[in-house]
């Protein structure tokens, strides 16, 4: 059997990190032999352990983190993988050369200087693959493999948990609280939707800014900041529509999640949603 090693630094929360976990669990269920090297994360480690996946936690620090580099090489030498799959810049750039196929997965338009030692690159949208080709990456060594989401239907929760009345329109938006996600635009739009409530599930550096904005324009009582959640399917199942307002969104996993939960999806026409959604047929683009 092909032996796989996956390496990811990653943040505690994020779309790439969620998909990594989803893929690792899926590969394990399919019988793939694998081990994981990852940055310390209690919840992610628990999920992998419960599935029977061996993982080691490393610091994945900046340039002078010599221990992580040494440890990765030692694990590779002992495990002798056939394929190393690395995720994003930090993990990819410190994978040593060796007698294995090094594949990196990109979920954005990353600087390819971190990927010079890779044998193959995977983009999760055709647009990212086009970017790789335009950056002179060999055509036969860049590949399109889309993301997937779990197809389990969620169970609606009691709206009262988040002080939201029954019988009013309820929309949801999910993701890291970053300027690229344009949650500020969505919150401003709430001023025009007098009876609508918004559940905003995510965490990040823009939390205080977005909270202040909601207070300033008088919608704070109708905008509920839920923090980062692991029960997104249940949250989406509770709401009337899912909104993806991102200024920059290479893919948009939340669009896929909204479809699985059979909810209307409304999105700004950034790259990912524009690729996924056929306006007026399986969603709305603005």
Short names for language-model regions:
Residues 279-280, 284-286:
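Conserved acidic donor-binding segment of nucleotide-sugar-dependent glycosyltransferases
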Residues 37-38, 264-267, 286:
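Short hydrophobic beta-strand element within catalytic cores of glycosyltransferases
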Residues 67, 133, 148-168, 230:
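Acidic anion/phosphate-binding donor-loop and adjacent secondary structure
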Residues 56, 119-156:
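Donor nucleotide-sugar binding/catalytic pocket of nucleotide-sugar-dependent glycosyltransferases
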Residues 64-68, 85-92, 106:
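Short His-centered aromatic/hydrophobic patch
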Residues 14-25, 169, 173-192, 205-211:
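A conserved mid-protein helix/loop that constitutes part of the nucleotide-sugar donor-binding site
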Residues 228, 247:
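Aromatic "clamp/platform" in nucleotide-sugar-dependent glycosyltransferases that forms part
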Residues 6-14, 18-68, 141-144:
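N-terminal strand-loop element at the rim of the active site
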